[in-house]
Amino acid sequence: HNGFGISSIGGASNINMRASQYAAGHKASLVGGNRNYLARVMYTGSTGLMQNGWAFTGSASYRWANEGVIEGTFYNSAAYFLAAEKKFNDSHSLSIATWGSPTERAQQAAATEEAYWLAGSHYYNPNWGYQQGKKRNARVVNSYEPSLVITWDYNINDKMKLITSFFGKYSMYSTSALGWNGNAADPRPHYYQNLPSAAYDVWDLNYTPTDDELADYNTRLEYWKSSKANRQLNWDYMYFANQQANAAGGECLYYVERRHNDQLTFNLGSTLNIDFNRYNKGTVGLQLGTTRGMHYKTMDDLLGANKYTDIDKFSVGDFGINSDYVQNDVDNPNRQIAQGDIFGYNYDINVNKATLFYQHLFTKDIFNIFWNAHVEG
């Protein structure tokens, strides 16, 4: 039985963010780690419920790692929590809380067992490479979800309590990724065509490779094992290829795009808890919610290129450069893209939901009987 709503199969988690519920005092901590982040520093302070009916609490933390346990990854994250509450009398109180955690972190990519064997480690991460001697990761996540909740507690009498909350959140989540057009070779070192096994079918034990195939295999094998840089992304080459394309007046060959999945969410919920008698308790509630999901790509880095046209480069070979089918935006054909511009796709998904529920709990001696019903749409 949950006094705030109907639980799912896995149960429910309810976090009390009322400032008056935090013990007065101060706390600071420093934590070390050897996984995603190296260290975390954190401070929390609370006033408790003061004589004037106010209560305040706040917390701030920072986590970071120049490089995690996986090579080429880094972690940089701050977090905050602020809450205030005013208790007007024994019947009414109003609380507000806001929190968020702006984070930037580099990712690891999965690879085949062949790539792990060639690299000599299952910690091998093909997402990074050297750019002018410094490590750069192609898959970097930026996330931030500033959130706000306002709660009104109304103790109607000894038997009934009404809790009404408004919640708002703007979720900003994006991850970068390498992109290339149909005239460029796949730059990923662990792409199957860049592995030694692409020389011939090495998995067929009954197949005898030709001299040329065997020489190709050994050349690829030596390339992979001779230098760590050879099994990572080659940023310097991608910049060079784009510079050559610039000189010829051509299109960008390699770039870094950023894929966004943002959400704007608002929820309003109200629950009435009723003690009918010593054996029976009930909860009736109404929940209203709306979410706008925004999905789009932006140009993160042109890698030195001067020109990028917003068309589907891989469809050009099937339909031709002048076909409408290759246009990502038919309202703005052949639009030139600069850093920060939206391109590729841009669409919204809107979800509106309303739920009305009732749940009842009967408790006597060793017996607990619980039932609920809800309607939503």
Predicted stretch roles:
Residues 132-177, 251-287, 293-295, 339-370, ...:
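Outer-membrane beta-barrel transmembrane strands
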Residues 22-26, 39, 50-56, 90-94, ...:
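Outer-envelope beta-barrel architecture signal
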Residues 189-206, 257-261, 293-312:
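Small-side-chain secondary-structure face that scaffolds active or pore-lining regions
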Residues 85, 93-151, 174-257, 321-339:
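Acidic/polar loop-and-plug regions of large Gram-negative outer-membrane beta-barrel proteins
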Residues 33-65, 69-108, 140, 146-156:
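Transmembrane beta-barrel wall of Gram-negative outer-membrane proteins
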Residues 30-36, 62-66, 100-104, 168-172, ...:
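Transmembrane beta-strands of outer-membrane beta-barrel pores
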